[in-house]
Amino acid sequence: MAGKGVIVDFDFAVANGSEILFKTAKEFLKELDGIKLDESLEARYLAGNGYEDGFSRLFAVAKTKKTAPKAAREFAAAFARQLTDAVPKAVGPSAKNFIKALVEKGVKLVVATRADLEAVKSALAFVPEEQMAFYRETSDCYGACRWDTWLRAAHDAQIGRPLARALAGSGFSVRSALRAGLGTAAVVTPHVAYQDFGGANVILDELSGKTAKKFMEALRI
């Protein structure tokens, strides 16, 4: 249906942001004060929380004197750099087929990202300009978009809430998209498979031409 738009959590639904985030956090914390991060600690203290809040909780357990606000700012910049480096590889043939299938249906794509916008625009240059919008994601939520991100992205692209759909890359993003009142699809990668994806209209294990059809049918596009 023409007029509908898909808000894409590029960092976690297109790029393998959950793995990049974990690796970045692991290296960052080790260099910061020798703090060892594993998947269990990440899930318990960081996932779904704001950077500062998550670090504050983790630092209390690690008994470090490092301050969470400063660490959060530095970590956000480090993640953005790593994410930007991964952009070209993220938009490979399979992801392109998924995107092209939506474009052929007249769907407008609104890409929310923390990566460098010029890098993302370059990777998506095959999409007609009139069917593409970009939103600078500024929230500091670890591994997810906040609920108001979805609404702001839709508003900036002039897509009414009833016509907006969300493509999320984590259980926390599914929850926030549902809170925003959006029909939601989720791309589930191994690193986030433990999260709760309940409420998503459809679960995808990858982006491809085949899953694009499944996506559009489930979300009535």
Show where each model-derived region lies.
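Asp-based, Mg2+/Mn2+-dependent phosphohydrolase catalytic module
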Residues: 1-3, 117, 121-221
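Short glycine/serine/threonine/alanine-rich loop segments
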Residues: 34-35, 107, 159, 182
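Conserved phosphate-coupling serine/threonine residues in phosphotransfer and NTP-handling enzymes
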Residues: 113-115
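N-terminal-biased segments
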Residues: 44, 49, 55-61, 109, ...
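Short, acidic loop-to-helix structural element flanking the phosphoryl-transfer center
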Residues: 81-111, 121, 147
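N-terminal helical cap/lid subdomain that shapes the substrate entry/recognition surface
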Residues: 3-93
